Swiss-Prot record:
Protein name per Swiss-Prot or TrEMBL: L-threonine dehydratase biosynthetic IlvA
EC numbers for this chain: 4.3.1.19
Listed NCBIfam families: PRK08639.1, THD1
Entry keyword Amino-acid biosynthesis: yes
Segments forming domain ACT-like: 346-420
Modified residues (N-acetylserine): 2
Entry GO CC: plasma membrane
Gene Ontology biological process terms from the UniProt entry: isoleucine biosynthetic process; threonine metabolic process
Molecular function via GO: pyridoxal phosphate binding; threonine deaminase activity
Residues that bind pyridoxal 5'-phosphate: 93, 196-200, 322
Pathway annotation: Amino-acid biosynthesis; L-isoleucine biosynthesis; 2-oxobutanoate from L-threonine: step 1/1
Residues where N6-(pyridoxal phosphate)lysine is found: 66
Description of how the protein assembles with itself and partners: Homotetramer.
Amino acid sequence: MSAELSQSPSSSPLFSLSGADIDRAAKRIAPVVTPTPLQPSDRLSAITGATVYLKREDLQTVRSYKLRGAYNLLVQLSDEELAAGVVCSSAGNHAQGFAYACRCLGVHGRVYVPAKTPKQKRDRIRYHGGEFIDLIVGGSTYDLAAAAALEDVERTGATLVPPFDDLRTIAGQGTIAVEVLGQLEDEPDLVVVPVGGGGCIAGITTYLAERTTNTAVLGVEPAGAAAMMAALAAGEPVTLDHVDQFVDGAAVNRAGTLTYAALAAAGDMVSLTTVDEGAVCTAMLDLYQNEGIIAEPAGALSVAGLLEADIEPGSTVVCLISGGNNDVSRYGEVLERSLVHLGLKHYFLVDFPQEPGALRRFLDDVLGPNDDITLFEYVKRNNRETGEALVGIELGSAADLDGLLARMRATDIHVEALEPGSPAYRYLL
């Protein structure tokens, strides 16, 4: 898959970053940032017919690429600015990168997090920042935490370190492309990048636009948080009414102003696609089971997008594994969403007659030899002729669904399928 270069992103009046700026950023952050491997993937190469490499930013010092941008911004501040303090608002990878950068520079920083931030993430922020970080709960939601950080900056004169919408942050993230070109013998045909606020894809696109002749960039957003796609469609950043938070590392409700300008100016060099959260979960599990890679949801976005894209056989493709800060307690939900996405898991409301043998009849008449009940919730009602049960069924193959539904229609027991997206279904996931 390839595309002809259009104009360079640096030609936008709003976006004045160049490849040379990113080269300088690479030298600036070199003492702190770990060059990450570019790992061939035999599995993905066999599936796509391309030569696929995985850029392993999950092996970065803080297990994500965010350190690059945070350090590149902080190291350019004056002594006076550093003395006034630095602030960020984040509950995820940006906060960890910021905290580690503060410790490396010996700079005191404050991180504002929402109250719902899991203890594991708070502990990782404190671990990376040590004595140089104050962790402050800034409200019940991320927006309130961000507002508290802004109030801090206005009150104290500290410097705000944004997660994506700053040229210094974008330049730092763009150093990934510097490494990729140095690790490959020839330039890639396609680089696949996860997209949240857009800092990473803006930096990578800027560098590739000036340093390659025919490399295309594919940005992958979660279907439930496609802020950049909405911005490009509207001709400016827009605020999404609702954002699905499952792919939390890419769940933003508004793309950055600078990052949008970079992609808008890149023209046909960049294309965007979306993948649903179930596809992301399947990609996460496949990466773990086949390559031994523990990717967070946003870290698996590029692979999920690759598998749904039209890839030119024989091309050279780089997929960015952007992070590996995943909470192991989420894997139950990851597996569940993956099974639903693959058509292997289904839920039904079954109206059982309140009589002996009804459940046995359902098992004998409806379930196939490879079907397995994974959920059964039923409360007997003595004053009713029937009682509803919530039943989850896992199939041996997605092709078995038609037979299961046919047997359900043939039985005298009333069965109603729960449709994905319905309120009851969302309760289960």
